[in-house]
């Protein structure tokens, strides 16, 4: 076969379609998942013919890109569609807007549909597990483009990705123990692979939010990139201390400013504009690197590293699914409903001290128990 015959080969032969899904799980109107192909960009800014990126975008900005049941299906479909597309070099997993990549499951849906309905939540968790599996099994590299806060379940699906490039405005952390759940959708499995056991422990249980620079420092993301512009020039996130310093004998980096410095930084952020061009340039740089590697050797290498993540994830995802079903009848009901009712009550958490006191007195879970620990409406 000569070169001209080889170039005509695809046009002369039928190519089988290995995609499981069409476009039925994607949309354009929030809440939804948006799926689109974009060309790979070379270092000179030119599109590379025949080479694309698949963008899987969580589109629910009004609720900080929290994923509904239908959106979970969209992520599963997006990962499989990217896997089966011969033109796709890498999958870019991101969110709409500049506030959030994802804040996890949709708390309104959790509170109003799944709480006190554990069996239904079990079906939902089967989909959630398939979403994490879909990311870990995608046959293209998955880059998490962190356009804003990556919290709770958003942190977990982000950790399942292969690499993360983040806006330096983003914050990272868990919310489960504060809001009625536990970070058993991946964080308990993945965080010890990124940081020390004690750092992973504190991140999981404290619900403390860490900056993108701190995440880069502990090795949890590849790079934090400035996205704020003042007078046409990029500046680093003014709310974060981005120079290393010594505190109590330890080197500290990426901590949030406090007091007057925090107030000054907040004022700067109000006048600045958000521009993701540097963030996207970093994503393009990684994708172009992938484009210039043998694709099967690339995926063998990635799957070899993913296997370590998958080992721990596969050990725990099914027992965790069953625990979450049971938990939806108790603490999850309280946590999700407290968060969902915060506009009416002014508080997004229960009275934890009262809750512990009632448990100490062996009080049964009843309607009266729940009412005793939930914040009353503000007008009462």
Task: Describe each region flagged by the PLM.
Residues 1-52, 86, 98, 211-213, ...:
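C-terminal alpha-helix plus adjacent terminal tail
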Residues 5-27, 95-131, 150, 178-180, ...:
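Glycine- (often His-adjacent) and acidic-residue-rich active-site loop
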Residues 49-59, 73-116, 133-144, 163, ...:
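A structural preference for short, pocket-lining loop segments at secondary-structure junctions
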Residues 56, 75, 93, 157-158, ...:
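Hydrophobic alpha-helical segments that mediate membrane insertion or helix-helix packing
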Residues 64-67:
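Short amphipathic alpha-helices within nucleic acid-binding modules
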Residues 71-75, 124-127, 279-282:
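Hydrophobic alpha-helical membrane-association signature
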Residues 134-295:
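Crotonase-fold acyl-CoA enzyme core
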């Amino acid at each position: 076969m000569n070169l001209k015959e080889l170039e005509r080969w695809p046009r002369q032969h039928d190519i089988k379609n290995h995609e499981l899904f069409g476009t039925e799980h994607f949309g354009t109107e929030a809440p939804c998942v948006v799926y689109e192909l974009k060309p790979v960009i070379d270092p000179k800014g030119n599109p590379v013919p025949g080479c694309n990126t698949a963008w899987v975008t969580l589109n629910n900005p009004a609720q900080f890109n929290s994923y509904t049941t239908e959106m979970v299906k969209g992520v599963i479909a997006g990962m499989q569609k990217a896997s089966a597309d011969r033109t796709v070099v890498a999958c870019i997993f991101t969110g709409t807007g500049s506030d959030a990549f994802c804040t996890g499951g949709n708390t309104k849906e959790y509170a109003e549909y799944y709480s006190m309905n554990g069996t239904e939540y079990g079906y939902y968790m089967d989909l959630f597990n398939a979403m994490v599996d879909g990311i870990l099994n995608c046959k293209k590299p998955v880059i998490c483009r962190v356009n804003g806060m990556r919290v709770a379940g958003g942190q977990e699906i982000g950790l399942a990705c292969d690499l993360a490039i983040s806006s330096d405005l983003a914050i990272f952390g868990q919310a489960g123990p504060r809001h009625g759940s536990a970070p058993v959708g991946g964080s308990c499995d993945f965080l010890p692979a990124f940081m020390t056991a004690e750092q992973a422990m504190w991140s999981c249980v404290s619900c403390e939010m860490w900056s993108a620079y701190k995440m880069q420092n502990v090795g949890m993301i590849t790079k934090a990139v400035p996205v704020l512009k003042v007078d046409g020039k990029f500046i680093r996130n003014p709310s974060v201390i981005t120079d290393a310093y010594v505190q109590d004998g330890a080197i500290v980096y990426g901590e949030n400013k406090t007091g007057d410095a925090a107030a000054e930084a907040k004022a700067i952020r109000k006048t600045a504009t958000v521009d993701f061009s540097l963030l996207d340039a970093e994503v393009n740089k990684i994708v172009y690197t992938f484009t210039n590697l043998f694709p099967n050797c690339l995926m063998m290498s990635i799957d070899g590293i993913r296997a370590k993540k998958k080992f721990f994830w596969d050990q725990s995802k099914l027992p965790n699914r069953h625990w979450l079903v049971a938990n939806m009848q108790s603490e999850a009901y309280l946590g999700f409903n407290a968060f969902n009712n915060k506009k009416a009550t002014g508080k997004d958490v229960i009275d934890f001290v009262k809750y512990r006191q009632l448990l100490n007195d062996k009080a049964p879970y009843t309607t009266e128990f729940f009412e005793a620990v939930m914040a009353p409406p503000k007008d009462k």
